[in-house]
Amino acid sequence: MLRLSPPDREKLFQSPRLRVIFGGGEANVAVSLATFGHAARFITAVPKHEVGDAVVNELRRWGVETGCILRQGKRLGIYFAETGANQRASKVIYDRDHSSIAEAKPGDFDWDKALDGIDWFHT
């Protein structure tokens, strides 16, 4: 997923700037495992355009295996994250409808290849 968040503790629509980070729970787990020297393979679907390329390259940069990532669909899921301040709680707004992974079907994946040699499958 693509995370968009305002700098510091600004509110989402208070700031003219947004930081761009690729992440999401499952991606964060894969990156953490790879960082600690474990083999990690990421299984998902991302768009076949420059944004999808950037996601795959970011995962590879951290040592995550990306050979089972499908390149299909037209959009990457997005989430907007505001960091809370004082009495204001943090807030997350998800925009995942019609993303590549949301529209992927189980039969789109080569599960024999994806699960080959896998001891643990995290969802």
Per-segment meaning from a language model:
Residues 22-26, 51:
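Conserved donor sugar-nucleotide recognition element shared by glycan-biosynthetic enzymes
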Residues 10-14, 110:
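A glycine- and small-aliphatic-rich helix-loop capping segment at beta-alpha/alpha-beta transitions
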Residues 13-23:
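Short pre-catalytic strand/loop immediately N-terminal to key active-site residues, enriched for Gly-Thr
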